[in-house]
Amino acid sequence: MSNTWLVVGLGNPGPDYSHTRHNIGFMVAEELASRIGASFKSNKSRALVAEGRLGMGGPKLVLAKPQTFMNLSGGPTSALAKFYDLGADNVIAVQDEIDIPFNTIKLKIGGGEGGHNGLRDISKALGAKEYLRVRVGVGRPPGGQGDAAGHVLKVFSTAEKKELPFLIQDAADAVELLISDGLLAAQQKFHPAK
């Protein structure tokens, strides 16, 4: 397994989307870039990319924010994986998840995309579903009713905005733990006991 990890924060480019639920992946990628002292730069893969090491002599992180809109995230992800010679097992996608309550993080590898078109496009472009996912709960519309697509394109509520910095930090911690200690250890920390 390579000592380089591609972490793809899913979101939509542009100021109209920057503070929406759908862009939580971008927010987590930005937090990780801040932690490793890296800046995002344009890349011919159609993504903003930041690179650095996780700790002194630690694994290399390639952080990506695809600039193709959410549903076309696969092209930039696949291009970067190919450029860095990474298999799907060294790719981590950070995504919003409406089927998980706000302020909750779930981690998994592979499986279905749960109706998330960004993940669907990544799976298709990589030719594999066996990549890690950091699923950041953004919850459903109030009352569980309403337009889910419209909900993820809205900004967080006032109450959610107070908790958002902590959620972003936790999701970034989850990415770091996935890389340093593996999926099982990260799940034990972030999945509440039943």
Curated annotation (Swiss-Prot):
It is found in: Cytoplasm. PROSITE patterns: PEPT_TRNA_HYDROL_1, PEPT_TRNA_HYDROL_2. GO terms for biological process: protein quality control for misfolded or incompletely synthesized proteins; rescue of stalled ribosome. It catalyses: an N-acyl-L-alpha-aminoacyl-tRNA + H2O = an N-acyl-L-amino acid + a tRNA + H(+). The record marks N12 as: Discriminates between blocked and unblocked aminoacyl-tRNA. Keywords: Cytoplasm, Hydrolase, RNA-binding, tRNA-binding. Its EC number is 3.1.1.29. One of its GO terms (molecular function) is tRNA binding. TRNA binds at Y17, F69, N71, N117. The record marks D96 as: Stabilizes the basic form of H active site to accept a proton. Hydrolyzes ribosome-free peptidyl-tRNAs (with 1 or more amino acids incorporated), which drop off the ribosome during protein synthesis, or as a result of ribosome stalling. Catalyzes the release of premature peptidyl moieties from peptidyl-tRNA molecules trapped in stalled 50S ribosomal subunits, and thus maintains levels of free tRNAs and 50S ribosomes. Monomer. Belongs to the PTH family. This is Peptidyl-tRNA hydrolase. The gene is pth.
